[in-house]
Structures are given as structure tokens and as C-alpha cells.
Amino acid sequence: MSNRIVKEKATAFSPYVITPHKMNYILPITFTDSLYKYPYEQVEQWSENLSDIEAKFQLSIKVPLNYNDIFIRGDSLYFGMTLESWWQVYADNISKPFRETNYQPEIFYVAPLNWHPFGSNTGFLIGAEHQSNGRSQLLSRSWNRAYAGLLL
């Protein structure tokens, strides 16, 4: 497996370690000239005041669900959670709401492979994830997906 995963496994059950999963970031200023306001117009009174300038951030963490090996030596099962938000922080006239927050829980299995090209570690992962904005009716969006990958 990649060196990162090997090092993460060494600290996985330390009570003071939070492991990042996907990229964590804060973009204090983002701009879009194509904000699709129609769904908001149907439910929110403030839709006409949405700003083209907003902040965006993503927080993503994971936790192991097993301490010992499951099927083979060095494998792990994880739960991951990613939140991605678009915040109308510069829209003073509508009290700076969060325009959208997407929630993405996932469960995935990671295992090492007995293949060491150029002396490196390799592995594979397989998982399932769901993404939803947590809204209902016209503003609702969600999807499910299964995935697999090779770790080099």
C-alpha cells in the first residue's frame, strides 16, 4: 500500500488523531456567473439576492472500523465523511446563509497487494458512497456510487 496508508494505520486508534480523508480546504472567495437560482426561487424568499461571490470549504475525515485484520494481514474497513459547503458570506442583505451543503458518507475497504514495483507498496480499495444535500422536494439532490481503485 502507499506509504501514507501504512503510516495512517500506525496511528489509526490513537485517541487524539483525526485522519483526513479527501482534500480539506477553505476558499474564502469564489465566483460564479452561472448560479442556477430557479430551484431557490420556488422555496426561498431570498433567492433573488443570492450573490455570485461566496466562500467554499470542504472538510473530510475518516475513521477505521476495525482494529485487527479482517480477511488478510494489513486490511482495514473505514467510514469516511465529507462535507462540502457554499456559503453566501458576502450577501449581507440575506443574512449570509449557506446556499448548499453536500454530505457524503462512505464506507470502504483497503487491503495490501503482494506486488512491489520499484520497491513500493501497493494495495486496492473498494467502497460505496452516498452524496446528498439533505434537502427535500425541489432542492433535493442525491446519488449513490460504488467504486474500486488501485493504490500505488
Show the residue positions of the predicted features.
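Outer-membrane beta-barrel initiation region
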Residues: 1-105
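Residues on the lipid-exposed face of transmembrane beta-strands in outer-membrane beta-barrel proteins
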Residues: 59-65, 105-111, 128, 148-152
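Short loop/turn motifs that connect adjacent beta-strands in outer-membrane beta-barrel proteins
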Residues: 66-77, 113-123, 138
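Outer-membrane beta-barrel pore domains and translocons
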Residues: 82-86, 110, 127-133
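Residue-level signal for secondary-structure boundary sites
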Residues: 89, 115, 134-136
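"Short basic amphipathic alpha-helical interaction patches in structured regions
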Residues: 93-100, 121-123, 140-144
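Detector for outer-membrane/organellar transmembrane beta-barrel domains
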Residues: 131-152
